[in-house]
Amino acid sequence: MTTKRAYKLQEFVAHSAAVNCLKIGRKSSRVLVTGGEDHKVNLWAIGKPNAILSLYGHSSGIDSVTFDASEVLVAAGAASGTIKLWDLEEAKIVRTLTGHRSNCISVDFHPFGEFFASGSLDTNLKIWDIRKKGCIHTYKGHTRGVNVLRFTPDGRWVVSGGEDNIVKVWDLTAGKLLTEFKSHEGQIQSLDFHPHEFLLATGSADRTVKFWDLETFELIGSGGPETAGVRCLSFNPDGKTVLCGLQESLKIFSWEPIRCHDGVDVGWSRLSDMNVHEGKLLGCSYNQSCVGVWVVDLSRTEPCMAGDTAQSNGHPEKRSCSGRDPVVLNDNNSKTVLGKLSVSQNVDPLLKETKSLGRLSVSQNSDPSTKETKSIGRSSTSQNSESSMKESKPLGRLSVSQNSDVSKESRTFSSTGSLPGTPHRVSSTNVSKATSGVSTAVSNAATSRRNFTKANPKANPVNKAADFAPVIVPRADPRIEQATESRAELDIIARTMPYSLQAADSRRSPSSRNNPDLPDASVLEMSESQPVEPNNIPDGGTLPGGKVGMRGATERSINDFRYKRYGRSNSRSRMGSPPRNHDENYDLVSHRSNRDPSPTESQKGGRFQSLVINRERRGRFSNFEGPVSNFSSGNMPAPNIRPSNMFKQRGNHMPVEQGIDSPSEENIVEDIMGKHNQFVSSMQSRLAKLQVVRRYWERNDVKNSIGSIEKMADNAVTADVLGIITERNEILTLDNCTSLLPLLTALLGSGMDQHLSVSLDLLLKLVRLYGSPIYSSLSAPASVGVDIEAEQRIERYSRCFVELEKVKACLPSLARRGGLVAKSVLELNLAFQEVSS
């Protein structure tokens, strides 16, 4: 290698006395704040040798510092227990808070809302309201100092780690301790949350890193012991690995399974903070009065480097560890979370779910002569197929038990969260060749209460293609069922709040990839609600055992599809609706039985979903059973989006003689499914954001409601809320007008007519209310004497004027759109002429 994997970016003298603490700004990763024994807080631009700003005010040494989410405020806790907040834009102290009886050694800002938490050597954890200028809650429970604390990304819990070796989880809403983790044997020095899942990682002086499930509050596993204590840790933004900073090295762990992939020797001594930015790890350490900034190139470390090698060798499914996900779910850049949830499948419609040690375990028996074992972290699935090959693969935490000799089904809707609907793998010994006109295949995946795991490229089962054949599955009247299912699912979507939902990515079997004689469709699956029965078997009579050729059977099955139009899509974007007769054209929809719940696969991703809501809903939904799907609390049912076997995946080749009318049909199907998946995900993300706004709204805190909308930068959410504000005249004050106008201006950049109409309607109302005083204030003479209220009012008028001028500049282009938008633009133009004349 010509380039070092780790190097020192800079080293500088930060204080005139010893440095006690430092923090990297998470928003930009370009700024650094340090606190020292010289009673000062210094602000630095990373890469520059001189301080941007020095903040004074404390009368004792600084023991903890941090930025808020926007890098506008800095909080610093001192040895006296006093906490001071500085506004960096004005370089002045905005709050001085007292309450701790000893050193304040940890601080953290709430992810949204004007709150922050502090931990002290007095063993107390305090929550502070910046607006009320005081402590709103004190949590007692630690027996020694609180070293580290973090708010959960949803802002509902705060997690603290202490010198007493205990990690405690506190519920901010209920104001009480939820649980505590006591497995560490040394003081807690660092903790971090998984970016997509309900997972907490903790690092300790006992030289181990431990992973905790925040839904079941169980220990998932432990990494180490290492050569030194874990001083800092941070999840890679892709969520696959956690980066652990030790005394003089960096260790890279995967959490499922837990193993150390790589170690990098770095020269940092007392590492204090680190952050991942654009594929680089930035670490900051201090020694006496000096601060060192270190960079580790993650693209040159395992497993990222292994992923790059795999891509060059023709395995594009390996993804880089740059921290950026190329797949976007919605306009807010929510990152796609593909499912790692896996299921085992077999011949008969039996589904037997058992819970062992708090997890589901699955065994399938098709032929006692062979076994296929699959394991992922905490669950294992054994499956006996006709081959004598034994495989070991990482899967999800769900496993299902199926037996080929019993024909019963046991479903559990209790707090264990197990769900029915495991698909069945159909062996060629039980299926004859397909007849034209009624052939289709449905790929379904089972889901559980814990279906929030992220995709792992290695977690794709390998199946011997020669052992499987297509299945012929009839269905009831699809027109009635589609309407019923669409209404039911939309109702469920409106009442639930996962952040991300999408189907697991099915990939081509390596066995079929290596054997040119085998087709790409390696396995065809069917729902448990549609077992192989005599009325499901085509006119071939008895089923030949193991003699059915996959190529011929698949060709016959696929040749039955003659898709001639794709324009119509229902709300579920399903695939594979069987024809009602041979002369009709159909969209791609999946079939289900009329009354049985369908197996589904869902995932939670994007940002951290509210765990409290998840727990509160267990009782409400635990026994829900509807025509669409059955699910436990917090799990969002969704259709299985991707056809896993009927059509080729990327990089696969379908036999030429199959005679598909259009060579791009499978791509069209994938596009349809992908768009539906994005729609569902964006709806759930929007719901989550609206609930954040609602919490402020219920407290009549309109100012912060508008402020939270501005931070979200989501046009859909903005339009939803502004549509309500338009009808509430009492909200349209001058103070709120200054906050609303930037949102309305930004909304004019949307390409949707609905958003434009909402913005133009509210703009028209504001111009009629405040247009005249805004424009007349510009020419008004200056007042004599000091009138603070008048000056504030004129300042608001000036800000409104700037935004209104931006709006006027946008109107000519909007007028060319025509329709209702052009009509609204004309009315707004007339209003501007009236108030400015």
UniProtKB/Swiss-Prot annotation:
The keyword Nucleotide-binding does not apply. GO terms for biological process: microtubule severing; regulation of unidimensional cell growth. GO terms for cellular component: Cul4-RING E3 ubiquitin ligase complex; cytoplasm; katanin complex; microtubule; microtubule cytoskeleton. GO terms for molecular function: microtubule binding. WD repeats lie at residues 14-54, 57-96, 99-138, 141-182, 184-222, 225-265, 267-304. It holds the Pfam family WD40. Disruption phenotype: The double mutant ktn80.3 ktn80.4 exhibits normal growth, but the quadruple mutant ktn80.1 ktn80.2 ktn80.3 ktn80.4 has a severe dwarf phenotype, with small and round dark-green rosette leaves as well as wide and short petioles, probably due to cell elongation defects, and associated with a complex cortical microtubule (MT) network with stable entanglements. Plants missing KTN80s have a disruption of KTN1 recruitment at MT crossover or branching nucleation sites, leading to an abolishment of MT severing. PROSITE patterns: WD_REPEATS_1, WD_REPEATS_2, WD_REPEATS_REGION. It is found in: Cytoplasm, Cytoskeleton. May participate in a complex which severs microtubules in an ATP-dependent manner. This activity may promote rapid reorganization of cellular microtubule arrays. Confers precision to microtubule (MT) severing by specific targeting of KTN1 to MT cleavage sites such as crossover or branching nucleation sites. Together with other KTN80s, regulates cell elongation by modulating MT organization. PANTHER family: KATANIN P80 SUBUNIT (PTHR19845), KATANIN P80 WD40 REPEAT-CONTAINING SUBUNIT B1 (PTHR19845:SF0). The DWD box is required for interaction with DDB1A. Belongs to the WD repeat KATNB1 family. Component of KTN80-KTN1 complexes composed of a hexamer of KTN1-KTN80 heterodimers that sense microtubule (MT) geometry to confer precise MT severing. Interacts directly with AAA1/KTN1, and weakly with KTN80.1 and KTN80.3. This is Katanin p80 WD40 repeat-containing subunit B1 homolog KTN80.4. It comes from Arabidopsis thaliana (Mouse-ear cress). The lineage of its organism: Eukaryota, Viridiplantae, Streptophyta, Embryophyta, Tracheophyta.
